[in-house]
From Swiss-Prot:
Gene3D superfamilies referenced in this protein's UniProt entry, alphabetically: 3.30.70.330
Name of this chain's protein: Large ribosomal subunit protein uL23
GO CC annotation: ribonucleoprotein complex; ribosome
Sequence similarity: Belongs to the universal ribosomal protein uL23 family.
PROSITE patterns assigned: RIBOSOMAL_L23
Length: 95
């Protein structure tokens, strides 16, 4: 099993994720090979909260160009984690 620090890469700070945070749902970019059980354990260990549900999605990279060179941004996996009523993650509070 992976370390919690390897599973969760960074939080997603967008207008939509801030609206979801009001509903006790927090969004993270996670390791692409991580499954829902690993994501749940990582969030519970790192933030001392109770996770009720985990939704994941794979996001394809966007095509980008740099002059004549074409490429793509990297693919990534996002997870939306629903917490128990009354629990919250402090890193989302001050944004």
């Amino acid at each position: 099993m992976r370390s919690p620090y390897d599973v969760l890469k960074k939080p997603v700070i967008t207008e939509r994720s801030m609206d979801l945070a009001q509903e006790n749902k927090y969004t993270f970019v996670v390791e692409p090979k991580a499954n829902k059980i690993e994501i749940k354990h990582a969030v519970e260990q790192l933030f001392n909260v109770k996770v009720l549900d985990v939704h994941t999605m794979n996001v394809k990279g966007k095509p980008k160009r740099m002059g004549k060179y074409a490429g793509r941004t990297a693919d990534k996996k996002k997870a939306i984690v629903t917490l128990k009523e009354g629990d919250k993650i402090e890193i989302f509070e001050g944004v």
